[in-house]
A protein has these predicted regions:
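Short polar catalytic/cofactor-binding loops
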Residues: 13-17
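Acyl-thioester C-C bond-transforming condensing/cleaving domain
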Residues: 1-7, 19-48, 62-134
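Short glycine-rich phosphate-binding loop at a beta-alpha junction
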Residues: 50-57, 114
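Ligand-binding pocket segment of bilobal, Venus flytrap-like solute-binding proteins
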Residues: 10
Length: 134
């Protein structure tokens, strides 16, 4: 078995945690995620074109944001050739995206990966069981 490549974190960015129904309730997760990804790339001192992949974890998917990782990647200025995928592992989704980024780099599948989580719980659909049939 070949030796695994070393992985380093070169940048980290986050938004403040808001309150449910608070001042960020109308801000889509894609907008918040793109802001963070763009700033992380800037702080790392790299060009978006060197990012091989974007991995975003998200617990609650909103229909119009069905492919949140790709939408965040494009909105953050990544080239359309940059691959992206979303991860759902409930509360561990953001951490799982980082684990997958590490594995991709260790095994030589990628050199530069942006990973994290994006969520706006205030925008998740409101589920009412049996409301459809009365």
């Amino acid at each position: 078995m070949s030796e695994l490549k070393e992985v380093v974190v070169v940048s980290g960015v986050r938004l403040p945690v808001g309150s449910y129904g608070g001042s960020l309730k109308n801000t889509p997760a894609i907008d918040m995620g793109a802001m963070v990804v763009k700033e992380a790339v800037k702080r790392a001192g790299i060009e978006p074109s060197v990012v091989d992949e974007v991995i975003i974890g998200q617990v609650g998917e909103v229909a119009e944001n069905g492919f949140v990782a790709r939408a965040i990647s494009l909105k953050a200025g990544m080239p359309k050739e940059t691959t992206a995928y979303s991860v759902n592992r409930q509360c561990g989704s953001g951490l799982q995206s980082i684990v997958e980024a590490v594995m991709e780099i260790q095994t030589g599948q990628a050199d530069v990966v942006v990973a994290g989580g994006a969520e706006n719980i205030s925008q998740l659909p409101y589920y009412v069981k049996d409301a459809r049939w009365g």
